Amino acid sequence: FLEDRINILYKNFAIGMCLVLILLTMFLRPSVAFWVAMGIPISFGGALLLLPLLGVTINVLSTFMFIVVLGIVVDDAIIVGENVFRRRIKLKEDNFTSTVKGTMEVMLPVFFGILTTIVVFAPMLDLAGDTGPIWRTFPLTAIPILVFSLIESTTILPAHLNHAGEWFQYCLLYTSPSPRD
C-alpha cells in the first residue's frame, strides 16, 4: 500500500514537472525555463529532508502547502533568470558579469518577497489548542521550501546560468527572432 502511494507521488511529480516546464517554455526562453524548473526539485527536496526533523509527515496538509508555495518557488527563479538573461542580451555583458550583476540587482526584492510570505506563516507556529499541531503543519512545510527556494534562486540558479555558456548561446540562436530583410 505504501509503495503504491509513493509510486503515485513520483508519477504525479514527473507529470507536474513536465507540465510546469512546458508552461514555462511557452512564456520564457527555453534555457531560462529549464533552469527555473530545476529549482523546484531542489527546493522541494531540501524541504523534504528537513520535514522529518521538524516532525512533519507527508500528508494532505503538507502536500497542499507544497502546491501553495510552488508559484513563489517558480516566481523568484523567473525574476533572477530573466534579469540575468536581460543583462546578457540587452547590455551585451559576458556570462559572469551578467550573472553577478543580474542576480544582485534583484536579490533584495526576491529576499523580501520570500520574507513577507514567511512572516505571514510564522504566527501559525504558535497556535495553541487541539488544532495547533494541525495548523503548525502549514508553516513547518512552507518555510523550509521558501528558504531553500531563496538559496536556490540566489546561488544555485545563477551558477547554472553562469556556466550555461555554449548551451545558452545555442538556445539563443533558436529562440531569438530572425532579422527581416
List where the protein language model places each region:
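Juxtamembrane "pre-transmembrane" interface segments
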Residues: F1-I22, P123, I134
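Helix-loop junctions and hydrophobic alpha-helical segments within the transmembrane domains
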Residues: L2, I6, G81, R87-F112, ...
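Residue-level signature of catalytic and energy-coupling elements of molecular machines
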Residues: R5, V20, A37, P41, ...
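Loop-to-transmembrane-helix entry motif
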Residues: I8-G16, G102-G113, F138-T141, I145
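Hydrophobic transmembrane alpha-helices and their membrane-interface caps
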Residues: C18-G81, F85-R86, P144
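Hydrophobic, glycine/alanine-rich multi-pass transmembrane helices and their short helix-loop junctions
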Residues: L21-F27, G46-L61, F111-N162
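Juxtamembrane helix-loop transition segments at the membrane interface in multi-pass membrane proteins
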Residues: F85-K90, A159-Y170
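Conserved small/polar residues in nucleotide/adenosyl-binding loops
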Residues: Y174-D181
